[in-house]
UniProtKB/Swiss-Prot annotation:
Protein name, per record: UDP-N-acetylglucosamine transferase subunit ALG14
Function of the molecule: Involved in protein N-glycosylation. Essential for the second step of the dolichol-linked oligosaccharide pathway. Anchors the catalytic subunit ALG13 to the ER.
Lineage, opening ranks: Eukaryota, Fungi, Dikarya, Basidiomycota, Agaricomycotina
Subunit structure: Heterodimer with ALG13 to form a functional enzyme.
Encoding gene, per UniProt annotation: ALG14
InterPro entries, per the entry: Oligosacch_biosynth_Alg14 (IPR013969)
Keywords annotated in UniProt: Endoplasmic reticulum, Membrane, Nucleus, Transmembrane, Transmembrane helix
Any one annotated GO CC term: UDP-N-acetylglucosamine transferase complex
Bilayer topology term: Single-pass membrane protein
Species in which this protein is naturally found: Cryptococcus neoformans var. neoformans serotype D (strain JEC21 / ATCC MYA-565) (Filobasidiella neoformans)
Cellular localization per UniProt: Endoplasmic reticulum membrane; Nucleus membrane
This protein's record includes keyword Ion transport: no
Length: 230
C-alpha cells in the first residue's frame, strides 16, 4: 500500500472513530460501569492542567497558587505550540515552591492549537481534527498501551479556550469504554459574568465539576457558584 493511501485510510478510520464517539455522547448516557479511581484524601493524585494562553493562563496560574504540590503529583502542563507565555507561567508556578518541588514531578505536553482567533471555518475544522488526532494519541492511546488500568492523569483542570474542549473529549473516551477515567474540573473565566462561554457550554455536560465565579452565570444545570477564585 502506498504512503498516500495509508494516510488516507488512517484519516478515514480516525474520522469514523470521532463520529462514533460523538454519537455515543449525544444519544447514550455514560457507561454505568465506568469509574474514577478511588484514593484516600492524603494519597497522591496525578494532575493535568491546560494553559490556554493569555488571560486564561493568568487565571489558571492564580488558581494553582494554593495547590498542595506534595499531593498533586506528578503534574502535566498542557499548552499549545508556540505559547511562550504559558511556558513562562509553568516556570513561575513551579519555582514558587522553591527547592521543595523536584523538577521530576512535572511534565510538559505541547499540542497544536485547535482554533486561532479569526480563523475561517473550513481551516478551523482541519485544525480541530489535527489537534484531536494528536491529543488522542498522546492522552489516550499511548497511556492505554503503557498501562490500560490508569488514565493519563487522575484529575484534569481546564478553563478554556477552545482547545480544552478537545482535551475533555479525549479524556472522556475511557469513561465511555468503562475504564478508570480522568475526573474533569472546568472553571469558567472571571470575565464571564452573566453567561457561559462557548467552550463552557460544550464542556458543561461532560465535566464532573463545573465552577463559575459570578452568581448570574450559575443559572444552568450542574453549574456551581463558588465565588471569585482568581
Amino acid at each position: 500500500m502506498s504512503l498516500g493511501r495509508y494516510i488516507g485510510w488512517s484519516i478515514l478510520a480516525f474520522t469514523y472513530l470521532v463520529l462514533a464517539i460523538l454519537l455515543r455522547l449525544i444519544f447514550l448516557q455514560p457507561s454505568k460501569t465506568s469509574r474514577a479511581s478511588y484514593r484516600p484524601k492524603d494519597a497522591k493524585c496525578s494532575l493535568g492542567v491546560f494553559l490556554g494562553s493569555g488571560g486564561h493562563t493568568s487565571e489558571m496560574k492564580a488558581l494553582l497558587s494554593t495547590l498542595d504540590y506534595e499531593r498533586y503529583q506528578p503534574r502535566t502542563y498542557i499548552y499549545c505550540h508556540g505559547d511562550d507565555l504559558s511556558l513562562r507561567a509553568v516556570s513561575d508556578i513551579e519555582s514558587s515552591k522553591g527547592g521543595l518541588i523536584s523538577s521530576k514531578m512535572y511534565y510538559l505536553l505541547s499540542l497544536p492549537r485547535a482554533r486561532r482567533v479569526g480563523q475561517p471555518l473550513l481551516s478551523t475544522m482541519v485544525s480541530v481534527l489535527k489537534t484531536l488526532y494528536i491529543a488522542a494519541l498522546r492522552l489516550f492511546l499511548i497511556p492505554l498501551l503503557k498501562n490500560p488500568r490508569r488514565p493519563f492523569v487522575d484529575l484534569l483542570i481546564v478553563n478554556g479556550p477552545g482547545t480544552c474542549v478537545v482535551l475533555v473529549l479525549v479524556s472522556y473516551i475511557r469513561r465511555i469504554l468503562g475504564l478508570e477515567y480522568t475526573r474533569i474540573i472546568y472553571v469558567e473565566s472571571f470575565a464571564r459574568v452573566k453567561s457561559l462561554s462557548l467552550s463552557g457550554k460544550m464542556i458543561r455536560p461532560l465535566a464532573d465539576r463545573f465552577l463559575v465565579q459570578w452568581p448570574d452565570a450559575s443559572d444552568s444545570d450542574n453549574v456551581i457558584h463558588k465565588g471569585l477564585l482568581v
